[in-house]
Amino acid sequence: KGMEAMFSEEPFKSFRNLFNVYMVMAVSKYEGIDGEQSANHSVFGSYFGDGTEIIGNDAKVNSYAQRVVTEEQLDNTLVIVILNSDYYAGTCYLSIPYVRDPELYYDGYFGDGPAIAYFTTCGDEDTFRRMLMHEACGHGFAKLGDEYFYSGNGMITNRDYWTYYYDLEPLNWYKNVHPQMDGTPTAETVKWSYFLADERYQYDGLGIFKGGLTYPEGVYRPTDYSFMRSNNGGFNAPSREAIYRRIHYLAYGIDWEYDYEKFVEYDAINRKSAPAATTLEAMPSVVYGEAEMMHCPPKITIR
């Protein structure tokens, strides 16, 4: 069920043939998951933390994953751990390399780094599918940032701001958010400016929307709603592009060169050809929108 859910959404659906998928059976002592005490009987030491957080034994998860991939291959492997619970929860753990080679930082490069996405069965198939899209496909595979925020968080912290620009941007991660503490990005300076200038994307609801990475100030996102904000609405164009790029980078290696026009040609199946019935004629350049439900942002570690 999880595998079919992963390939139910573009661009994963169109490029399913480029993926290898393995299932490793792991049986816990007792059924289900609960608070911290459940770590004692869960095969991966999994338990619920605060909000929607899930904590697990990453080292043990990786040891099970190495039954089907090598330790070296883990750098490019997304590991999904599905927990038997109807409770709505999910957390993705991302690792970035401590030593990075600046010579690899070219336009097509997509930084390596293992990922473990923990989430529950969520109680129904549609919620499960959307959770998988956000945690596993968005964070874990495409290295996308969260597009939701909480009003109480205020301005993005200096630590998170510089983590983005020093650690993540050189790896081409978080392509769907634009942190900027001083002023507001314009249609010419925002990270996805080329989509805003492309008339083929005029009906995709793209703009400069305020709020992201859990902060209402200092971070901007490309659409009001998407899988990376509210677990619905599909992946927006910058996110689809990031997914497309990482699929091809992993499938064809460093000799693969990204071509924007080839992406746009593929992406015709996802673009809207006419305005939606609820679209306003004049959308403000900066739009606010707070998250409706508590989420847990990805946990990033430098290894």
Stretches found by the model and what they are:
Residues 1-151:
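Active-site-proximal segment of zinc-dependent metalloprotease catalytic domains
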